[in-house]
């Protein structure tokens, strides 16, 4: 990272030379810019958009006062991403770890991923089918090649499938059965932060 003397201009070398989307297209600095533009777009609902207001002119763009080209984020090259901030902030590097800074593809929103799996099939109200991303580096050998998320609206039906081993994960159990599941060591709780 290169930082200006006023701590307002940051140039990041995107160390993603070999990272590819699930369709084989290389990830570039422009994909990060596209993500920020989408989040700042006034028609995009976002609970985290205020965090982007540290970037020069981001709020003015969100308020439709200026074009996106005036916002302090740009791709200097395929591998260089520049941010210009309104003022120096010590926590800027931490903000970059938030999902609003993850890369996105304008031409294929929601259809490609850089993660270990991609959405192969979605049957509304029935299931999601995730498949191994063939371009994901270091995919664990023991990891499943496919993951199926079944949507089962009735809690009691889902519980029966779980008890008989036909479901590996149960995200919601009837309260009356919770103690039994806890005694068997089948309950794990992960608080949301």
Language-model features and meaning:
Residues 1-8, 15, 112:
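N-terminal lobe/hinge region of extracytoplasmic solute-binding protein
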Residues 11-15, 26-33, 38-104:
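Surface-exposed binding/hinge segments that line
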Residues 12-14, 129, 148-151, 168-172, ...:
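Structural recognition of the beta-strand scaffold that forms the well-ordered cores
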Residues 37-45, 97, 135, 163, ...:
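Sec-exported extracytoplasmic/periplasmic mature domains
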Residues 64, 68-70, 78-79, 84-146, ...:
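Gly/Pro-rich hinge or "lid" segments in bacterial periplasmic/extracellular proteins
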